[in-house]
Amino acid sequence: MNPVFDRRRLLLAGLAVGTVLVLAAVVLGVWKPWSPGPSSAAVAGAGHDDAVTIAPAPLTLPEHPTVLVFGDSWTYGSAASEPTLGYAYLLADLVHGTTIVNGVRGSGYLKPGIDGPAFGERIAALDPALTPDLIIIQGSINDRAQGAAGYREAVTAAWDAMAAKYPEAQIVILGPAPHELPVGAATARIDRDLAALAAARGWWYISPVADGWITPQNYRDVIDVDLGRKHPSTAGHRYLAERLAAALADLGGAPVTVAGGSETTPEQ
């Protein structure tokens, strides 16, 4: 046996083992198989813009739908010459159906109203025997002063309750419309929150803020700034009903119709 040759062979073997160990350490350091991957909750909660969204299905309604319109004073018909001239009532003719109007003045997801509690309690009190084809949940600017804390949780709970009560109904969220211009920061925050939450569920969201329903050019035609205390006027309610009907038609790809045939609407 040649002792020099044996030492050389042992040295080469040691170098080979060392190289393998170094490579393994590098691979494991990069791969880190023991570290858990990011959870879906963490990814979704990383930021509004990064949240996972679900594409809504086209809105499909029967020829003569029953529509539950649920919201605040705008849904109630405040500042119209008669509450029944409010947008939620006028919508019935525009969709060739029937509307069930449930509006409580001053109410929101967090804020109790003048005539009833906040949205969550009101949803719990709805008649489970109703069979709406479509539910429109409107608003609300009434939550502006309540702040962001707990807002998304209240919205989620209310929407969960509505969907559980009427599982066969399609649900469309109608965001807050500005009662004054420029649009306030709190109203804009509510609009963003509702849009993100609706997108995460695959629900349609209609944003009067983003779509410019109320502008400096038509503001005084739509909003009664005197006796109406910055609520839609009678003409304003008609205008809002037409904008909503057109938006709903777009969600289903149907032709857009205008209310009242030759009736004029406030300038846009």
Q: What function would you assign to each model-found segment?
A:
Residues 1-70, 74-81, 93, 245-268:
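N-terminal secretory targeting modules
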Residues 13-29, 97, 127, 134, ...:
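Hydrophobic alpha-helical membrane segments, chiefly transmembrane helices and signal peptide h-regions
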Residues 103, 175, 207-209:
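Residue-level recognition of beta-strand->loop/alpha-helix junctions
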Residues 180-268:
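Catalytic His-Asp segment of secreted/periplasmic serine-dependent ester chemistry enzymes
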Residues 66-68, 74-154:
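Conserved SGNH/GDSL esterase-like catalytic core that processes O-acyl groups on lipids
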Residues 61, 65, 81-86, 146-153, ...:
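Soluble non-cytosolic domains of exported or imported proteins
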Residues 138-142, 161-192:
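Active-site segments of SGNH/GDSL-like serine hydrolases
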Residues 123, 155-160, 191:
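Generic structural signal for well-ordered alpha-helices
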